[in-house]
Amino acid sequence: MRRVVRQSKFRHVFGQAVKNDQCYDDIRVSRVTWDSSFCAVNPRFVAIIIEASGGGAFLVLPLHKTGRIDKSYPTVCGHTGPVLDIDWCPHNDQVIASGSEDCTVMVWQIPENGLTLSLTEPVVILEGHSKRVGIVAWHPTARNVLLSAGCDNAIIIWNVGTGEALINLDDMHSDMIYNVSWSRNGSLICTASKDKKVRVIDPRKQEIVAEKEKAHEGARPMRAIFLADGNVFTTGFSRMSERQLALWNPKNMQEPIALHEMDTSNGVLLPFYDPDTSIIYLCGKGDSSIRYFEITDESPYVHYLNTFSSKEPQRGMGYMPKRGLDVNKCEIARFFKLHERKCEPIIMTVPRKSDLFQDDLYPDTAGPEAALEAEEWFEGKNADPILISLKHGYIPGKNRDLKVVKKNILDSKPAANKKSELSCAPKKPTDTASVQNEAKLDEILKEIKSIKETICSQDERISKLEQQLAKMAA
């Protein structure tokens, strides 16, 4: 006999907003008209793009810093135009990237215990876009590899460790790029664009692997993200302005595997995906709800689970990585919902009677250790994320400081030749060891210089004291 109700351990997932005293209050959330999430979260900090006079800024708050946030609280404020997107580095919880209307990408190192003074000096400024930068996304498995996309319709992939733009995809999109998503091992990216196309791209070969014209026929913005199995999940609008979600196989994008119509609201649907549970959470900008679906390999493939509803509309949304969740409370997702003047955490829980660790809810998940160095990835290597167990809770290790070793500008070829140089098949592999040795040498030279300066100043001080002693003796 066929079951009427599909069996799923996530059928009873429920959402709950935290109490008022656990919210972050009196925050002037950015009003800039851009469809990014405006919020980024990791197990240490929550970062929120805010309104700022005379440039762009964002707040970085330690997770425990709840309650009213003072107007004089320090910010990250080095951009000269509004900040449009922020993204925490998955391999270092103190490093965050930001893209701005000032056409630059900046990478910041946050002190271990948070900011005590406003931060105006980034670790590195990445300049290469000719128009505003609306998207920044770190590589999921390679250290110091950062992608940025701008309103110049270009995607640039940077080696943050050297400050170099190593891949420039500037001729693949004929219109504005709405979003970019890395595949699970970071070998491919998928993009959604204003020309209504969804593209799957191999960035190192600079090739479009698959594309679908009119993935959604409506004119409003789309989103496309990679799932763990290599399929692509999209959100968009129908010709009649109904919000849609669809599932695609990049090997055959003629027809979607599944297509669902939801409602006629006009907020862009931001998808947040958990590869461990195969749940997708959809947060509409301007909505007051979060809908969640389970993706399986049985028809109809995208299964509606439930909706979390609240009264206030959301201006943006942050999504906590799995290693930042409380496994003892069967928490499977935590969102940070932006209101006009505050940030409110929302906790998604699977009700369980037992207090024991629930292995089926928490398979090994992506940890903070990078599987590859940047040079290895640019040479063509791929690696899946290094997994960790959450059985005894995640204990953050010590993060190493981000060091940028700029190469001699005279050694690099002119920018015009960069693309053709990259597109040639035979490529001399970068010597990783020599780059690391250069970095160490640089560090040692800096230390020697500072020791010399200290000795000089001490010498001066000693001679002054000797003179004073001589005067006193006389």
From Swiss-Prot:
Gene3D superfamilies, sorted: YVTN repeat-like/Quinoprotein amine dehydrogenase (2.130.10.10)
Say which domain of life the source belongs to. Eukaryota
Q: Name one GO molecular function term.
A: actin filament binding
* Residues with the N6-acetyllysine modification: 446
* Subcellular compartments: Cell membrane; Cell projection, Lamellipodium; Cell projection, Ruffle membrane; Cytoplasm, Cytoskeleton
Keyword annotations for this protein, in alphabetical order, are:
Acetylation, Actin-binding, Cell membrane, Cell projection, Coiled coil, Cytoplasm, Cytoskeleton, Endosome, Membrane, Repeat, WD repeat
Flavoprotein recorded as keyword: no
Coiled coil spans: 435-474
What tissues has this protein been observed in? Detected in skeletal muscle (at protein level). Detected in fibroblasts (at protein level). Ubiquitous.
Q: Tell me the membrane topology, using the record's own terms.
A: Peripheral membrane protein
Please provide one cellular component term from the Gene Ontology annotations of this protein.
Answer: ruffle membrane
Asked if the Swiss-Prot or TrEMBL record annotates the protein with the keyword Glycosyltransferase, the reply is: no
Function according to Swiss-Prot or TrEMBL: Plays a role in directed cell migration by regulating the activation and subcellular location of RAC1. Increases the presence of activated RAC1 at the leading edge of migrating cells. Required for normal organization of the cytoskeleton, including the actin cytoskeleton, microtubules and the vimentin intermediate filaments. Required for normal cell proliferation, cell migration, and normal formation of lamellipodia.
So what family is this one in? Belongs to the WD repeat coronin family.
Q: What is known of its domains?
A: The C-terminal coiled-coil domain is essential for cortical membrane localization and oligomerization.
**Name of the protein in question:** Coronin-1C
Q: Which organism is it from?
A: Mus musculus (Mouse)
Give the gene that encodes this protein.
Coro1c
